[in-house]
């Protein structure tokens, strides 16, 4: 079973907590998540940290996956500056 999470245009600290909670819920129920990052105009490091930790936690738990799709230019640029493209499996 797959579910989708859509990141808002401003994915900052206020989004990080609820996103973490959603990831934990999905991991515990074995639900794979797809994160749509196409609308992001600004993303903060706390939100990216939650996404990286989420990728790692899903991989460690097994049975479900976390995929980030359609990263916006702003999302990709911030992830690149912070050296997180590989950790988020977004390539170069």
Question: Where are these predicted regions, by residue range?
Answer:
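STAS-like cytosolic regulatory interaction modules
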Residues: 1-46, 52-92
């Amino acid at each position: 079973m797959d579910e989708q999470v859509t990141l808002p245009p401003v994915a900052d600290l206020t989004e990080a907590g609820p996103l973490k909670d959603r990831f934990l819920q999905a991991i515990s129920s074995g639900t794979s998540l797809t994160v749509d990052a196409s609308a992001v105009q600004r993303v903060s490091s706390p939100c990216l940290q939650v996404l990286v930790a989420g990728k790692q936690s899903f991989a460690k738990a097994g049975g479900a996956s976390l995929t980030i799709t359609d990263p916006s230019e702003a999302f990709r640029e911030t992830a690149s500056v912070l050296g997180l493209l590989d950790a988020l499996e977004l390539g170069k």
